[in-house]
Amino acid sequence: MLIGWIESNLTNMFTDVNEKVGTIAAEVGQTPSGWNGGVYQMIRGLSENVIVPIAGIIITFVLCYELISMITEKNNLHDMDTWMFFKWFFKAAVAIYLVTHTFDIVMAVFDIGQNVVSGAAGVIHGNASIDIDATIAQMRTGMENMGVGELLGLSIETLLISLCLKIMAILITVILYGRMIEIYCTVSIAPIPIATMSNREWGSIGTNYLKGLFALAFQGFLIMVCVGIYAVLINGMIIADNIHSALFSVAAHTVILCFSLFKTGSLAKSIFHAH
């Protein structure tokens, strides 16, 4: 009876590990428009109705500043040519185009990120899922040689480890949802930094914003890498001869996974040099 209970706990635990890989891949691979249509429409409405008018004011200021700078830097108005005005009109057209197509640009960035995550999910899910039946069969041989006391201790261990995995799953869900909320907040204010990109001095605001956007998009890939490493390590530890050691390794790797997921955001920003 104890062996049957332990096998049931192990089956549930390994099933959770396999499902977690697929669940995280599905969550991380979502774009802002696909994750929650209602939230996306609200954010888009706020951006277009509240932020875009402010971005228009910023464009006006930036373009006026740009025109004054272009004129005054030419020897106090004595050395001027008509070409600078064509250049200014081109900058103005580009700036207006970028602001009016901000959401297309932002969604394109996350479409790239989604494509990368989807490709990674296929590789990770195919190579890192645990063969539950084979693993349980291998463990059954070791459990049949254990006494009642050791089996009772092992059953408690499996119960605790299974509970630990469920808690970690909740924390991972919090991380994933927190990332999506951060994405929505970042997207909502997109027109303002984009409006500064036509100016040499102010353009760093928009450039840094795009870096942060790419960091958020590719954070999903880093999350998939962490999950893939976790699943492969778990798969290797499960087949260990010492069942107790294998179970505690599962717990240790789960804690490491959760810590690694918390670090993916700062790592992605560091890679893209986003402040």
Task: Show which residues each predicted segment covers.
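Non-cytosolic segments of integral membrane proteins
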Residues: 93-189, 223, 227-272
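Alpha-helical transmembrane segments of multi-pass membrane proteins
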Residues: 212-224
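Alpha-helical transmembrane segments and their helix-start/interface "positive-inside/aromatic belt" motifs
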Residues: 1-6, 80-98, 102, 206-215
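Alpha-helical transmembrane segments
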Residues: 194-211, 239-240, 270-273
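Alpha-helical membrane-interface segments at transmembrane helix boundaries
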Residues: 43-52, 83, 87-90, 144, ...
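Binding/recognition "hotspot" determinant
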Residues: 1-58
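Hydrophobic transmembrane alpha-helix segments characteristic of membrane transport
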Residues: 58-94, 189-203
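Juxtamembrane "helix exit" motif at the C-terminal ends of alpha-helical transmembrane segments
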Residues: 56, 60-72, 223-238
